[in-house]
Amino acid sequence: MTGKRSKTNCRSASHKLFKDKAKNRVDDLQGMLLDLQFARKESRPTDVTLLEEQVNQMLREWKSELNEPSPASSLQQGGTLGSFSSDICRLLQLCDEEDDATSKLAAPKPEPADQNLEAGKAAVFQRGYNLVQGKSEHGLPLVDNCKDLSLAAGNNFDGTAPLEYHQQYDLQQEFEPNFNGGFNNCPSYGVVEGPIHISNFIPTICPPPSAFLGPKCALWDCPRPAQGFDWFQDYCSSFHAALAFNEGPPGMNPVVRPGGIGLKDGLLFAALSAKAGGKDVGIPECEGAATAKSPWNAPELFDLTVLESETLREWLFFDKPRRAFESGNRKQRSLPDYNGRGWHESRKQIMVEFGGLKRSYYMDPQPLHHFEWHLYEYEINKCDACALYRLELKLVDGKKTSKGKVSNDSVADLQKQMGRLTAEFPPENNTTNTTNNNKRCIKGRPKVSTKVATGNVQNTVEQANDYGVGEEFNYLVGNLSDYYIP
C-alpha cells in the first residue's frame, strides 16, 4: 500500500513537473507569436523570418524531448497525445508540417513550348510583331501589337545568363513570300519575290558612312540614305515609305510648318528631282495654290491661325511652273482677287550644283504692315511639268516700312521730284508744249534733285536694291499727279 502510494506520488510529482515545464514553454511560445504578429503588422520582414525560425526551433526541441525514451517522459510512462490539451496537440501537429522556409523546393513545372528558345525558334519575335501569321489587315504589321513586345520578351529572361541578340530574334527568321509590308494598295512598290531575312534590316539602324554618298531617302525632309530593298528601295525604312505615300497624294493640303521648314535648298531640290522621277516624296500637288488667288483668301489651303510666339510659317507644295511670272519687264504675276497686284520677282538664282533655278517673289503691296508674304519657286532643268513652291508668312516689325509698299509721304515727294524734271525734256515747239505737259514718255530712271531730302533718296534706293529691279524700263505717264510708284 505504501509502495503504491509512493508510486502514485512520484507519478503525480513527475506529471506536475512536466505540466509546469509545458506551461512555461506555452507562455514563451505565446509571447513569440505576439511578437510575430506585431512584426507582420509593422512590415518587418527580417524580424518575421527570425521569429518564425525561433518558433519552429522551439517546437522541434519540444517534440524531440517528448520522443526520448526517458522515464521522465510522460509518453514513455503510458501517456498519450490525447492526454495533452488541445492547444498543445495543435502546436505539435503544426510542427510536423513543413513550412515554406524549411520545405524543399517542388519540382518546376515544364515551361510552355513557345517560351523555349530552342524549340520556339524566335517565338518572341512572332508573338510581338505577328509577322509570320500572314499579312496585316490594318496597314503596317510592324506597328500592330507592338505593345506586347516588352511583356513577351520579359518572359524569356530568367537572370541566369545574358542572351545574345541573335539568340532572341533568330536572324534567320524568314517572312512569308509576297510580303509587301502593308502596302497592299500601292502598285508602285510592287511585291517581294521570295523570302526576306530579318538580318537584312539590321543595317537600317546604323548605315555605314559610304551609304550617305549614294541616293538619299525620297521622303522630302529625310537626309538618311535609301536602303535599296525591293519593296521600299527609294526610302530609308518602311515607315518613311508609308509617310511619303500617305502624305503626298493629290487633293491634300500643302505641307505646313509653323516656325519654318528649316531645310537647306539641297533637300528641296532633291525632293523635286525625286518627284520628277516618279517617286512619292510626301508633298502634295496643289494646282494654282499660289497664283489662282491670294493666299489669305484661300483658308481651305493655308491655315492662318497664328500660334503663340510664332513668327514664321511656311507651306510646301508642288504646282505647274507659272511662266506668267516672267511676263513683261517687271516679272510680275497679278492675282485676280487683289486688284491687279500680286507677286513680283525680286531675285533669280542659278543653282548649278542642283541643275536648276530658284526664284524669289514678294507680295506687292503687302496686305498688312506687320506681316510679309514671300514665295520661293524651285525648278530643275530636266523637268518642265512640275515646280516646287515654298510659301512664307513672316511677322515683321510694324515700325519698318513693309517691302513692296511705299508710304504715302514717299509717293508725294516723288511726285514733286517728277515735276522738277521738265528741264531735262525741253518742249519741241510751242504748239505741242501744252499736250506734252499732260503726256510725256519718260525713259530710264528719274533723276532725283539734289535739293530733295536725303532720307527720301535713301528710301527709294533701298527699295530698288531690295527687289533687284536693275534694268531700264519705260513708263507712259498720262497725268503726273496720278503717278504711282509700285
Swiss-Prot record:
Assembly, per entry: Homodimer. Interacts with phytochrome B (phyB).
Region described as VOZ: spans on this chain: 208-405
Swiss-Prot/TrEMBL induction comment: By far-red light.
Record's subcellular location: Cytoplasm; Nucleus
Stated name of the protein: Transcription factor VOZ1
Lineage: Eukaryota, Viridiplantae, Streptophyta, Embryophyta, Tracheophyta
Positions annotated as zinc finger (C3H1-type): 217-240
Gene ablation phenotype (knockout): No visible phenotype. Voz1 and voz2 double mutant displays a late flowering phenotype under long-day conditions.
Organism: Arabidopsis thaliana
Listed GO biological process terms: cold acclimation; long-day photoperiodism, flowering; positive regulation of DNA-templated transcription; positive regulation of long-day photoperiodism, flowering; red, far-red light phototransduction; response to heat; response to salt stress; response to water deprivation
One GO CC term, this protein: nucleus
This protein's encoding gene: VOZ1
GO molecular function: sequence-specific DNA binding; zinc ion binding
Keyword Transcription: yes
Domain remark text: The VOZ region includes a DNA-binding domain and a dimerization domain. Contains an atypical zinc-finger followed by a basic region structurally related to the NAC domain.
Transmembrane segments: none
Record keywords: Activator, Cytoplasm, DNA-binding, Metal-binding, Nucleus, Phytochrome signaling pathway, Transcription, Transcription regulation, Zinc, Zinc-finger
